[in-house]
């Protein structure tokens, strides 16, 4: 839902004080007339730059003159242009270049001066002179996209500006410059749908009353204009408040103001050029820029808003916006529900609602004063990435007619608007105003701050940072309220030439910072703005101009601002809020980080890092001392502030902070009248009690600041004695009571804070002790567990080592026993033969294993054979390998135990470091607690000093009171009033305080009751004495009456003397009673304070004892840890010993392994010798026992071997049969699939051929009909000609033509019938040929299989064992190859086979496979037929290659190797049979072959040579397809050549060949 914003000008009602003036600015009438008539000047709307603010029409609907009027840069300052330069600088441009062409990538770009206006127009010209006509203009409001073009152009820092009609490429000199330009230009396409507002407030459209002014004032008022629409806009609560605001301001320093004359101004006059922030360009000026002094203005009328003549940018390029005489106050509906803004709203609205009334009264009082303040601001730019704004405040002396004028000029908060809340944050710091008097003031504090410098930027700077607008002193103060308070130019009423200056002392800073996301830890760049107590961050400065806020942070909620060296970015710092939320920021340099830290800490009220904590308090005390006015009565000096700890801010209440920040900290009151003083104190107490104690700590500082602003220094009013002393006494009593209540409230607050701090300290101490105890117990448990685990592992390792030692000893003993056994056997068998000894020596092996080998003694060496020896050898070898594996496993376990020991050592070191860290932290916390206790004692001593000072003041007031009692009537009045008050006190209830709910108020109430009772006793005694004095007076009067006749003069004198004496006595008695009551009260208080001191000392002793206990616990834990460390050291030593033992054992194992290896080598040598000796023994045995050998044994042995071989052969044959069956089944399935595929292809080809023939017949019929029609038409023409020639020739010609036509018709009909018959015959022949080929191939395959079966049977029937062995070997090798191929199939092989077959039919076709040339190539290219004709003359090996692919595992499984050459030939024959002619078949018909087929079939039909139609048809065919004859001749001529055409060409030219043969036969017959 979008609403159109209509900016109207409504003149305000004239004020009652002045009549309405007829003179107004001329722009109001111009705007109303411009809407009805044609708009003569296009002025862009502030919300939608493409619309005019006068007529609300689009830019395109305006005339060229109106647009040119907007574009011009006026040199006359009285008529400024409506648009401004947002950014300018030198860039490089590539005009209309196509970067897809590599030539443009190497060209040089053109350097041009770019100017971006605020209405979205981007122009570039050759130089930076304003008179130069721009070369091109880009409307950024129509731009679709602004992106980086580095990949497209190949140039770094390039940008692509994509518009609907063209793409413009630009680039900067550096990456920063191009990024700045990209950020600014990319905001235009992104903000197309962002200009619509949802609401306007017509109530804010108020203009103050006008008065006749000079031309200079009018030009000044039109020149000063609000140049930006800020995100935060505050509105006045009513029209009257706005009128009061505007009426209290004056515009120019040269304008004069008379008493009672109304002030002439408009709202647009408040938005001066010098208030502009100048950040809309998105860049800052470099530090090394030269500053230039401002030249005097052209005239006095434009002194405030004029521009520098020497500044070429400011004088020629910059054009001020045409300001409307009246503008409406608007509020943008903020629809962003961000958490930060909501939190700030929640924390601030409580304060704002409570103090709304007070602030509004202060504002009314401030606005009703007739003071005039001047304002002059300049700016200073510090660095490229940030901008610091230091607020310079100069104090001026003005007359003060009302005490409320000293209060800060603030405005009431709007409770329902977020911008009002944000402005409340900004306005939280009050300004300090000095009071002037006719007399010379005392020493005042002059605030010396840095004077901002005015920089000027040359236009030719290629970085583009123009900074054409001056910077605003307070950027957030964009509304008229704040400008009227802080930045209004006026002239002093005294007529001095130099106006006084006042500025807001707000913290302000801007710059680029990197912000880290808490979830993803990614860094993003934002434009940060610190204004007052709010830290805003935007995407870029342009978003700040438009008010598009990314987030806001309340600086008052910060508890720490510290550097962050552990961050991934350099120059990082961390902000922590009261709810433990962290915000990590990073700057681009250390200097900027330090400046940000300083400004943020000062804005948050935190102490600086590099300065001592006392400095801020001392400076504040010094400032307050300087601001105090000279008093008529002596004031006690303020006590110096104690050491400033971080806990002070945390535990300080709002009331304490307010009193400390106010001027009377240390002194109870400034010397002001008692009535005003008591009222102010009561009001401050009420405001303190109204604050909620449950508010979060985020509002702590705001409350402190508000209290501080409430308690500003009061005016000095000289004390005037009242005519009656009774009122004075009453007022003094009230003041004393108020002071006593204040002292009691303060003491109660101090006690409450002390109790809270003590409770928190004790709770923290207990928590830390519990935490330390738990951590120590955990550490002990973990250490004990680790020690237990280590001990278990060590015991296990020791047991394993012992087992290994036992097994080694057992193995060594076994080896020694075996050696002895071998020696004994050798000694026993030494007498035997040499052969037997060698046999025994080599048959018995050496047992060298680590396992149990006791069974070696049971071995009979005579019964050992070769197999048993091999088995024994394998068994021994396996045992030895097991022993080696066990040794390796032990080594691995040893390594694992070493690694575990290292990990335990590391864990122990980490625990020790953690313990030391904990000890350090505990020591630091103990020091902090001691420091806090010391701070509390200092505060207690300062409170005692204040109590003493208050006692002195009470004594002085008592003296004054005793001296002021004069007269009897006054004393009676005073006593009656005191009596009445006591009666009221008795009857009424004591007032409840805000802290009555707490238990700490019960002793105070009891003390107050005691004090009231004592006062009642005193009053009763004084009343009795007064009654006695009255009775004495009555008696004296009666005596006087009786004695009047005797001596009237003496009696009167005596009566007067007695009265005087009585009065003096009564006064002395009353004063003594009052002194006694005061002394009693002070004594009671002293007793209470002593009791509290004793309690505090007891608490201190208790804390000291707790500290001693904690120290003892720490010492005990240290001793425990030392013992644990000693145990660890002893265990380390034991572990080292164990490691040494393990090393020794590993060395012994290595030696034993070497020994085993040597023994193995020796065993191998012995085995070789044993084998040789066995061979020799066999030869000797054969030679000796050749004659006695038994033939039956040989036969049995050979029969067993033959049986084994036969079983093997049977197994191989069964495997072959199964494989053969599997192969045949696979082949049959493949054959069936191929037959089905070929049948389907055949059917499709036949259907296509029939469709082609039908289409050809239809085409021939249509061609014949057309030809007949042409012939008939031609015949008619010739017939008409012949008729014209004569009737004689007509008869003969007609007969001849009729005969020709009849013959032609008959021939056409006959040939069409013949052609259709031949086509049908050809189709039938083709089908028969396919069936014959398939049958032939199947028959050949079956024949080959039968031959294979015969071969297998022959192999099976053969009785030759050698052939069987060879056959089985080949079978097993083939089986292995078959298995390998079945497991992994290799790449397919291309087999080429040449086979030439001829058939008995006339249409002889070769059954070879297809050539590599595709049919589309031969038909699309007319030269392809010639290439095929040339390829037909090539050798037959290249022509007849087959592309049929068979996997190698199928070939290997289907072929059985044979020993003779016949198997090889049969195998090749099987390859040829498998490679059938139809395997590579493809249908010959294609949809795009129709024309060629028609031409081939029509051009070679057997037509009579005498027919004209045949001749013309041949000519047309020869002209249309000259290559067709070559195709047919090349395909038909070599009939006996084995290189025959493929099936593609066969089906294509079958009908043509048949017709050709018929034509040849007819020619031969003729």
UniProtKB/Swiss-Prot annotation:
Residues 84-190, 506-605 form the PH domain. Residues 646-663, 976-989, 1423-1438 have a biased composition (Basic and acidic residues). Keywords: Repeat. One of its GO terms (cellular component) is actin cytoskeleton. Transmembrane segments: none annotated. InterPro entries: Actin_Cytoskeleton_Reg (IPR052223), M-RIP_PH (IPR039597), PH-like_dom_sf (IPR011993), PH_domain (IPR001849). Residues 1-16, 23-32, 392-405, 990-1003, 1393-1414, 1520-1536 have a biased composition (Low complexity). It holds the Pfam family PH. Signal peptide: none annotated. Residues 1-32, 194-318, 373-415, 483-509, 627-728, 976-1004, 1375-1438, 1514-1544 are annotated as: Disordered. Residues 211-224, 236-269, 373-382, 487-496, 627-636 have a biased composition (Polar residues). One of its GO terms (molecular function) is actin filament binding. SUPFAM superfamilies: PH domain-like (SSF50729). The keyword Repeat applies. Residues 271-293 have a biased composition (Acidic residues). This is Protein outspread. The gene is osp.
């Amino acid at each position: 839902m979008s609403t159109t914003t209509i900016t109207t000008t409504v003149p305000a009602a004239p004020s009652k004080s002045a009549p309405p003036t007829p003179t107004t600015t001329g722009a109001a009438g111009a705007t109303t007339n411009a809407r009805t008539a044609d708009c003569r000047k296009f002025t862009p709307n502030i919300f939608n730059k493409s619309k005019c603010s006068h007529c609300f029409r689009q830019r395109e609907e305006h005339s060229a003159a109106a647009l040119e009027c907007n574009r011009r840069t006026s040199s006359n300052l009285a008529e400024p242009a409506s648009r401004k330069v947002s950014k300018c600088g030198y860039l490089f441009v590539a005009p209309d270049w196509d970067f897809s062409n590599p030539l443009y990538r190497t060209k040089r770009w053109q350097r041009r001066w770019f100017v971006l206006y605020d209405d979205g127009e981007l122009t570039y010209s050759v130089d930076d002179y304003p008179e130069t006509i721009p070369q091109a203009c880009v409307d950024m409001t129509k731009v679709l996209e602004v992106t980086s073009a580095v990949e497209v152009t190949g140039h770094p820092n390039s940008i692509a500006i994509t518009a609907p009609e063209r793409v413009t490429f630009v680039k900067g000199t550096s990456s920063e410059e191009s990024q700045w330009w990209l950020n600014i230009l990319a905001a235009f396409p992104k903000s197309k749908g962002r200009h619509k507002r949802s609401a306007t407030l017509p109530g804010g459209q108020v203009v103050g009353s006008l008065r006749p002014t000079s031309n200079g004032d009018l030009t000044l008022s039109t020149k000063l204009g609000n140049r930006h629409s800020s995100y935060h806009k505050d509105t006045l609560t009513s029209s009257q408040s706005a009128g009061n605001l505007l009426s209290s301001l004056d515009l120019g320093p040269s304008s004069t103001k008379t008493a009672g004359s109304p002030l002439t101004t408009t709202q647009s006059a408040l938005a001066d050029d010098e208030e502009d922030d100048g950040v809309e360009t998105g860049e800052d000026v470099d530090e090394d820029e030269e500053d230039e002094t401002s030249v005097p203005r052209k005239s006095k009328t434009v002194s405030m808003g004029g521009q520098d003549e020497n500044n070429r940018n400011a004088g020629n390029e910059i054009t001020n916006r045409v300001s409307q005489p009246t503008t409406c106050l608007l509020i943008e509906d903020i629809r962003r529900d961000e958490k930060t803004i909501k939190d700030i709203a929640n924390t601030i609205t409580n304060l704002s609602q409570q103090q709304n009334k007070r602030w509004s009264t202060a504002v009314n009082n401030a606005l009703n004063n007739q003071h005039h303040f001047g304002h002059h601001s300049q700016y200073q730019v510090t660095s490229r990435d940030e901008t610091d704004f230091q607020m310079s405040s100069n104090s001026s002396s003005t007359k003060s007619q009302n005490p409320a004028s000293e209060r800060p000029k603030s405005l009431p908060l709007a409770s329902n608007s977020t911008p009002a809340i944000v402005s409340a944050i900004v306005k939280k710091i009050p300004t300090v105003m000095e009071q002037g008097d006719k007399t010379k003031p005392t020493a005042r504090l002059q605030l010396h701050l840095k004077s901002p410098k005015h920089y000027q930027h040359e236009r030719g700077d290629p970085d583009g940072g123009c900074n054409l607008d001056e910077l605003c002193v307070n950027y957030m103060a964009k509304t008229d309220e704040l400008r009227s308070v802080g930045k209004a130019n006026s002239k002093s009423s005294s007529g001095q030439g130099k106006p006084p200056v006042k500025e807001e002392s707000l913290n302000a800073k801007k710059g680029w910072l990197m912000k880290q996301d808490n979830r993803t830890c990614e860094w993003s760049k934002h434009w940060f703005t610190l204004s007052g107590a709010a830290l805003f961050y935007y995407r870029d400065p342009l978003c700040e101009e438009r008010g598009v806020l990314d987030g806001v942070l309340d600086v008052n909620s910060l508890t720490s601002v510290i550097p962050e060296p552990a961050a991934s970015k350099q120059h990082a710092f961390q902000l922590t809020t009261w709810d433990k939320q962290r915000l990590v920021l990073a700057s681009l340099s250390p200097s900027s980080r330090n400046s940000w830290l300083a400004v943020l800490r000062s804005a948050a009220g935190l102490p600086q890092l590099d300065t001592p904590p006392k400095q801020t308090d001392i400076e504040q005390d010094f400032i307050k001392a300087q601001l105090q006015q000279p008093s008529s009565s002596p004031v006690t000096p303020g006590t110096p502030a104690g050491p400033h700890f971080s806990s002070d801010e945390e535990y300080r209440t709002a009331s304490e902070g307010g009193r400390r920040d106010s001027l009377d900290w240390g002194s109870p009151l400034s010397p002001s009248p008692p009535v005003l003083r008591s009222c102010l104190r009561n009001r401050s107490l009420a405001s303190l009690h109204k604050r909620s104690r449950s508010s979060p700590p985020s509002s702590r500082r705001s409350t402190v600041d508000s209290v501080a602003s409430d308690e500003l220094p009061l005016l000095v009013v000289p004390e005037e004695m009242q005519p009656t002393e009774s009122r004075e006494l009453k007022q003094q009593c009230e003041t004393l009571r108020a002071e006593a209540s204040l002292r009691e409230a303060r003491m109660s607050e101090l006690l409450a804070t002390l109790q809270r701090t003590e409770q928190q300290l004790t709770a923290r101490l207990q928590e830390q002790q519990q935490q330390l105890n738990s951590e120590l117990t955990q550490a002990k448990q973990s250490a004990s567990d680790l020690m237990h685990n280590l001990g278990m592992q060590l015991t296990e390792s020791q047991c394993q080592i012992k087992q290994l030692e036992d097994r080694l000893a057992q193995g060594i003993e076994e080896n020694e026993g075996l050696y002895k056994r071998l020696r004994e056997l050798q000694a026993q068998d030494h007498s035997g033969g040499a052969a037997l000894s060698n046999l025994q020596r080599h048959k018995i092996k050496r047992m060298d294993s680590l396992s149990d080998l006791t069974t070696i003694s049971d071995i009979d060496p005579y019964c050992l054979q070769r197999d048993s020896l091999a088995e024994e050898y394998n068994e021994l070898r396996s045992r030895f390998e097991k022993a080696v594996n066990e040794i390796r496993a032990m080594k691995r376990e040893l390594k694992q135990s070493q690694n575990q020991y290292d990990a335990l050592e590391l864990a122990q070191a980490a625990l020790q470091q953690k313990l030391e860290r904990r000890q350090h932290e505990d020591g630091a916390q103990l020091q902090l607690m001691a420091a806090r206790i010391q701070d509390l004692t200092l505060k207690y001593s300062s409170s005692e000093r204040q109590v003493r000072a208050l006692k002195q003041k009470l004594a002085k007031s008592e003296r004054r009171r005793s001296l002021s009692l004069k007269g009897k009537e006054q004393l009676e009045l005073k006593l009656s009033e005191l009596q009445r008050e006591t009666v009221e006190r008795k009857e009424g209830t004591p007032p409840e305080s805000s802290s009555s709910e707490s238990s700490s108020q019960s002793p105070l109430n009891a003390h107050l009751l005691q004090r009231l009772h004592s006062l009642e006793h005193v009053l009763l005694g004084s009343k009795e004495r007064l009654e006695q004095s009255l009775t004495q007076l009555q008696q004296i009067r009666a005596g006087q009456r009786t004695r009047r006749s005797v001596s009237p003069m003496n009696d009167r004198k005596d009566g007067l003397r007695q009265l005087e004496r009585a009065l003096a006595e009564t006064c002395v008695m009353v004063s003594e009673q009052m002194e006694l009551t005061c002394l009693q009260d002070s004594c009671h208080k002293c007793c209470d304070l002593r009791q509290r001191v004793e309690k505090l000392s007891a608490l201190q002793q208790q804390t000291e004892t707790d500290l001693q206990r904690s120290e003892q616990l720490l010492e005990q834990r240290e001793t425990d840890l030392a013992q644990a460390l000693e145990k660890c050291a002893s265990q380390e030593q034991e572990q080292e010993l164990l490691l040494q033992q393990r090393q020794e054992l590993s060395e012994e194992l290595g030696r034993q392994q070497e020994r085993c290896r040597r023994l193995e080598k020796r065993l191998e040598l012995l085995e070789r010798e044993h084998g040789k000796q066995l061979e020799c023994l066999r030869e000797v045995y054969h030679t000796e026992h050749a004659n006695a050998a038994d033939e039956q044994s040989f036969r049995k042995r050979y029969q067993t071997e033959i049986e084994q071989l036969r079983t093997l052969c049977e197994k191989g044959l069964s495997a072959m049969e199964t494989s053969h069956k599997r192969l045949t089944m696979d082949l049959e399935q493949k054959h069936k699939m191929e037959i089905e595929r070929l049948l389907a292809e055949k059917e499709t080809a036949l259907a296509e051929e029939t469709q082609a023939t039908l289409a050809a017949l239809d085409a021939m019929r249509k061609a014949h009909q057309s030809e007949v029609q042409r012939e008939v038409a031609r015949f008619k023409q010739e017939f008409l000609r012949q008729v014209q020639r004569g009737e004689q020739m007509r008869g003969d010609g007609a007969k001849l033509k009729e005969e020709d036509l009849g013959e032609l018709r008959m021939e056409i009909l006959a040939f069409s019938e013949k052609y259709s018959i031949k086509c049908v015959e050809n189709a039938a022949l083709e089908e028969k040929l396919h069936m014959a080929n398939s049958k032939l191939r199947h028959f050949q395959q079956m024949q080959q299989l039968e031959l294979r079966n015969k071969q297998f049977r022959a192999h099976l029937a053969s009785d030759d064992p050698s052939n069987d062995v060879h056959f089985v070997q080949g079978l097993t090798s083939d089986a292995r190859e078959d298995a390998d191929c079945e497991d992994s199939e290799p790449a397919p092989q291309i087999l080429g086979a040449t086979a030439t077959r001829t058939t008995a039919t006339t249409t002889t076709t070769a059954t070879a496979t297809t050539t590599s040339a595709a049919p589309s190539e031969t038909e699309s290219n007319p030269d392809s037929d010639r290439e095929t004709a040339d390829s037909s003359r090539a050798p037959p090996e290249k022509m007849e290659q087959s592309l049929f692919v068979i996997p190698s595992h199928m070939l290997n499984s289907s072929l059985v190797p044979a020993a003779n050459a016949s198997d090889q030939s049969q195998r090749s024959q099987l390859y040829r049979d498998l490679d059938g002619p139809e395997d590579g078949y493809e249908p010959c018909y294609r949809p795009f072959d129709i024309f060629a087929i028609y031409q081939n079939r029509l051009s070679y039909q057997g037509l009579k040579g005498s027919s004209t139609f045949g001749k013309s048809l041949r000519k047309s065919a020869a002209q249309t397809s000259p290559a067709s004859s070559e195709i047919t001749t090349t395909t038909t001529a070599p009939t006996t050549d084995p290189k025959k055409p493929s099936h593609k060409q066969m089906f294509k030219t079958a009908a043509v060949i048949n017709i050709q043969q018929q034509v040849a036969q007819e020619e031969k017959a003729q």
